């Protein structure tokens, strides 16, 4: 009897402990305390110092930190738009999650995973402040302080082995301070190509998780474990300097950089038509690359010759070989007046094979459609023989990012042996002012070539964002780029039609060594004037 009583005692003890744990868990989860009171609301002026210290972490950043701006207008916008944003975000989340779930569930022998209910609730996130950084690069950097105490209802049904279980997420709280970078800024809507998101500190994430109606987060120890795991996992993926990159625009279309160089050799023309009374002509060829701001390039004039030979070579930077075309126009030079067009034709770059010489014989026409005003093609105008070579840039020379490379004054070690292309981007100027007028434009001199930007009328802080290229046979390790800001009067008859607003000479050796430089230069002969110039050096081999 003593043995059986001992066994029964142990069984009773086990049953009692089990029932006690179950009853205690149910009471802990489902019974609400009765001593809950609404918080007392008082003005800040009535708070004592200890209460103020307790409330200090909850004060918005725009109050504590002068670098942060108040953005109540964004909060009002979110409050008004949240019912519509909620539906749109949930619909997008379902569409993104569906193929991922379908791919993963066979690995775990799960029949299905479905969203029975998905809503983010009626409370939108709020921004406690926002800090904006200004840089010389084509980017916009923002650091908002985000707080979101939401009442979502996310109910997921999981079916496996003939059983169904529901998991519900409620009472979500997220406090985070992300850094959002929009770059590069481009002239195509929405005006930026990528979104870079980083977290400046570990986020605070809190939520309720129910399984079959029971709150799993109420289990002692589980809440803290889950919260720390979420913080660590999110920090490992997105804590600065790690970033989440969201592409918005196709890089090739958003930021059209030169991708190669086309070498053009004008060999000869055959059978040109007579243009003067003596039965001859003074032909020359004008070459233009479509969608390029660089002026047309010209051959020399061959006097009194209907079958001229030039054998002259030219180079053009290519941005889109699939759409750009070379336009060849033959003109008859006139000593007085404008030259007369003798014929023209075009050649699409997409017909070129990279790194392969190819000869073309182009039949000259009056216009691209062969005639004018709907008339049939005119008489024979001769032929033009040209040779082309398209050399795309190597992968090493293509731009990999938009981070600034600082220029360093040092000897040109490792200078490339072959020639290349110098890209000059004139961004903007600041505090330029003339004595008689301020209609600024920029004139660039480099190795005997000249480039000009457009004129900006009556502006002390003009923006151009214009790009120019210089084809060079060898690296410019000893040359300087002369940049001059000028102003011309918009009126006729003034005593001072043109004046200099400042200039700067930029050594190009640093660009050859470092591939890229983007900075502001103080203008000489200007009181406070500055100009922002971006330089790049690219080789074709």
Curated annotation (Swiss-Prot):
CDD domains, alphabetized: C2, SMP_SYT
Native organism: Arabidopsis thaliana
Binding-site residues, Ca(2+): 276, 282, 332, 334
Domain SMP-LTD: 67-249
Family: Belongs to the synaptotagmin family.
Segments in the Cytoplasmic topological domain: 33-541
Residues covered by region (Phospholipid binding): 227-509
Membrane topology: Single-pass membrane protein
TM segment ranges: 12-32
Keyword Transmembrane: yes
Name of the protein this chain belongs to: Synaptotagmin-1
């Amino acid at each position: 009897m003593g043995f059986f009583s001992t066994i029964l005692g142990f069984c009773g003890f086990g049953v009692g402990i089990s029932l006690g744990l179950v009853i205690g868990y149910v009471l802990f989860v489902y019974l609400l305390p009765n001593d809950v009171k609404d918080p007392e609301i008082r003005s800040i002026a009535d708070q004592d110092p200890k209460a103020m210290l307790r409330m200090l972490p909850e004060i918005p950043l725009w109050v504590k930190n002068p670098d942060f701006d108040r953005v109540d207008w964004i909060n009002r916008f979110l409050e008004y738009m949240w019912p519509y944003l909620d539906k749109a975000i949930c619909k997008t989340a379902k569409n993104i999650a569906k193929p991922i779930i379908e791919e993963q569930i066979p690995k775990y022998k799960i029949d299905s995973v479905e969203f029975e209910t998905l809503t983010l609730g009626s409370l939108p996130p709020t921004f406690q402040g926002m800090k904006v950084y200004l840089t010389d690069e084509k980017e916009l950097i923002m650091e908002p302080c985000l707080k979101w105490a939401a009442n979502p209802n996310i109910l997921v049904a999981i079916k496996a082995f003939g059983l169904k279980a529901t998991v519900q997420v409620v009472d979500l709280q997220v406090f985070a301070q992300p850094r959002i970078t929009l770059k590069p800024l481009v002239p195509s809507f929405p005006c930026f190509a990528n979104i870079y998101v980083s977290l400046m500190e570990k986020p605070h994430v809190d939520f309720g998780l129910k399984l079959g109606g029971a709150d799993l987060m109420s289990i002692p120890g589980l809440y803290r474990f889950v919260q720390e795991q979420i913080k660590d996992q999110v920090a490992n993926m997105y804590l600065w300097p790690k970033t989440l990159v969201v592409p918005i625009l196709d890089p090739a279309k958003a930021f059209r950089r030169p991708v190669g160089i086309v070498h053009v050799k004008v060999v000869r023309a055959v059978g040109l038509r007579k243009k003067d009374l003596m039965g001859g002509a003074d032909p020359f060829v004008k070459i233009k690359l479509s969608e390029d701001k660089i002026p047309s390039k010209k051959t020399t004039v061959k006097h009194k010759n209907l079958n001229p030979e030039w054998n002259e070579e030219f180079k053009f930077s290519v941005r889109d070989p699939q759409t750009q075309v070379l336009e060849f126009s033959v003109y008859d030079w006139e000593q007085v007046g404008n030259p007369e067009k003798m014929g023209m034709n075009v050649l699409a770059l997409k017909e070129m094979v990279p790194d392969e010489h190819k000869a073309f014989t182009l039949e000259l026409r009056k216009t691209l459609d062969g005639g004018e005003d709907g008339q049939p093609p005119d008489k024979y105008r001769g032929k033009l023989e040209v040779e082309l070579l398209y050399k795309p840039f190597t992968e090493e020379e293509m731009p990999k990012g938009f981070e600034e490379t600082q220029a360093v004054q040092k000897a040109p070690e490792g200078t490339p042996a072959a020639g290349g292309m110098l890209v000059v981007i004139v961004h903007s100027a600041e505090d330029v002012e003339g004595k008689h007028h301020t209609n600024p434009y920029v004139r660039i001199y480099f190795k005997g070539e000249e480039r000009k930007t457009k004129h900006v009328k009556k502006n002390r802080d003009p923006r151009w964002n214009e790009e120019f290229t210089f084809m060079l046979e060898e690296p410019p390790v000893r040359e300087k780029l002369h940049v001059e800001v000028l102003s011309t009067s918009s009126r006729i008859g003034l005593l001072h039609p043109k004046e200099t607003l400042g200039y700067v000479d930029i050594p190009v050796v640093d660009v050859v060594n470092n591939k890229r430089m983007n900075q502001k230069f103080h203008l000489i002969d200007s009181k406070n004037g500055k100009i922002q110039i971006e330089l790049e050096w690219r080789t074709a081999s």
